[in-house]
Amino acid sequence: MKFVDEAVIRVEAGDGGSGCVSFRREKYVPDGGPDGGDGGDGGSVFLQADENFNTLIEFRFERFHMAERGENGRGRDCTGHSGKDLILKVPVGTRAVDHDTEEVLGDLTTHGQKLLVAKGGFHGLGNTRFKSSTNRAPRQKTLGTPGEVRSLKLELLLLADVGLLGMPNAGKSTFIRAVSRATPKVADYPFTTLVPNLGVVNPRPGQSFVIADIPGLIEGAADGAGLGIRFLKHLERCRILLHIIDIEPIDGTDPVESARAIVGELEKYSPKLASKPRWLVFNKTDLLLEEELQQKVDRIVKEMGWEGDVYTISAYNRDGTNELALKLLDYIASLPPEDNEIDPDSEVEFKWDNYHQANLDSVNEDYVDEDDDDDFDDDDYDVEVIYQR
């Protein structure tokens, strides 16, 4: 299936049902009191993470999603049915962003997690709600409020512990093939990898981590060169980055300049991402003699001013790859667990209890009627509809 990691959709929550103006009519009770019921609440729209999905391709072809409207109230104090909520299944790792305001609504990082993205409208009130000692025959009702309408941008961010970055043809895909059972395409030309790939690494029995391989970066990627930086977002949730450097580029480019270009593009894209733990990994060491290799590694590290961890591997021959995988496993195990608790401040607030209270108070204060409700004639009055904004 085609990998799609971005989609823009429109979600519409259901409108609330309107209240009803009705009066009790039974045998021997020709002029009963009010019995108009409330409307039903409109259905809301939720996103739910599902581990059985791994792409957003369905949302490319189906962009409009609407929840059910609440039913109107009816006589005999019958409340209208609430609209059915609409639940949209998305892959684990999906981020929801308001397309108009760029506000991040939330991240779905665990299977079954739900996120409210459009709140259903509140139900209207029937005339029974306006009954009081001074208003025996109320002809007021309120309409249901409109449901929330939102344009959403869905972004799929891969969930991985380790992220690979580097120039095209640095050997990232070869490395992920060497340490996992992933089989990304490998060839001797740039940009062989066109979409991100995931691999599960098992250095020890019962212990594993996930590694992500993204298409290579080149200088100017932040300005759209090559495949741009659209795939860098997949590294945002990684806990450590491996900067793969081709120790002996076939095109004769300077590894130092290439490494600096990658770091520069990373900082342009996101200083937060650039500040993540990062290890230097020199690949294709089988192309150099041992003494020459060490001299070249020392020179590159010195010119870069690098003070972090440095490793040398040959992904093609799988020299040093298992040792590096073990180091990564131990490092990830030493990190504190990630905090995925939902921020309560990010949840949608809705004032259910006092939403219509202002209308009820104003009607009861302004409306004074000393007559009993058994002595009125329906035809002498008009129904008053109270509109809510």
UniProtKB/Swiss-Prot annotation:
GTP binds at residues 166-173, 191-195, 213-216, 283-286, 314-316. Residues 1-159 form the Obg domain. Residues 160-333 form the OBG-type G domain. Mg(2+) binds at residues 173, 193. Keywords: Cytoplasm, GTP-binding, Hydrolase, Magnesium, Metal-binding, Nucleotide-binding. The keyword Metal-binding applies. GO terms for biological process: ribosome biogenesis. Belongs to the TRAFAC class OBG-HflX-like GTPase superfamily. OBG GTPase family. PANTHER family: DEVELOPMENTALLY REGULATED GTP-BINDING PROTEIN-RELATED, MITOCHONDRIAL RIBOSOME-ASSOCIATED GTPASE 2. This is GTPase Obg. It comes from Shewanella baltica (strain OS155 / ATCC BAA-1091). The lineage of its organism: Bacteria, Pseudomonadati, Pseudomonadota, Gammaproteobacteria, Alteromonadales. The gene is obg.
